[in-house]
Amino acid sequence: MSAGPASSRRPSLLRALVRKSEPPRAFYAPEVFGRAAITNIAQALPPLERVYANIRFSILRPKLLSVMDLLLPDEGRILDIGCGFGLFAAYFGQTQPRRRIVGIDPNARRIEMARKVAGKLGLTEHEFMAADARDAAVRGPFDAAYVLDVMHHIPPEDQLPLLERLRDLLSPRGVLVVKDITTEPAYQVRFTELMDRAMVGWEEPLTYRHHREWGEMLSSLGFKVRMVRVPDVLPYPHVLYVCTKPR
């Protein structure tokens, strides 16, 4: 659908803002850059995938992503686990263009789309691999890694080994950011489960854990863990786990 003349100039201006090679961090307004990045990503996708992207960005909204953006390093190698269509790799790559993101996902079709999106956005340093993160042939070290709403889709017996592998791939003082949900309040968990089922169906097992349980698991791996409960207009019980690897 075509926008009116006044609005048609806006995406070009936003692209110019987002693609500045070194946005000055002291004056960086994450939500402004984030909305611009989302606009660019949507325009780089085919119609069906654009619908999916709109759903994902309605769950992980600019306010939440802007918090994560400030937690990740401004530059260096960053690992994206369960990257799908590369939406968040494209997002974080636009807000800080010196980031080199490596995305891993088992779905080859999604990986191919992630490569196309990154190419259209000029993110030539990004890499994408069709593989299972638990045994992917990826080599560290990485300055950071993130796992966004993926852990509760991983079988319980594989969760700790995956997190252990991510720790080993990080450089000293590297940061692992995990975004998942907690198990309270009950109505928010139920809402989240319904949304998950709408996306993946009823056959796939889901493993939701209380935030204290996730915190203990991550701490057992030697991480210094900070837990941040992120409020939202939608009833998702978001929790960010900011995990720093020791020296």
Please place each PLM-identified region on the residue numbering.
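A conserved beta-strand element that flanks and buttresses the S-adenosyl-L-methionine
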Residues: 146
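Conserved alpha-helix/loop element of class I SAM-dependent methyltransferases that forms part
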Residues: 57-75
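Conserved class I S-adenosyl-L-methionine
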Residues: 75-84
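A short glycine-rich, Lys/Arg-flanked "PGG" loop and its adjoining helix->strand segment in the class I
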Residues: 160-172
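Class I SAM-dependent methyltransferase SAM/SAH-binding core
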Residues: 87, 91-124, 129-134
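C-terminal alpha-helical "lid/dimerization" subdomain adjacent to the S-adenosyl-L-methionine
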Residues: 179-221, 227-233
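N-terminal, positively charged/glycine-rich alpha-helical extensions of SAM-dependent methyltransferases
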Residues: 2-48
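Class I SAM-dependent methyltransferase Rossmann-like catalytic core
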Residues: 42-60
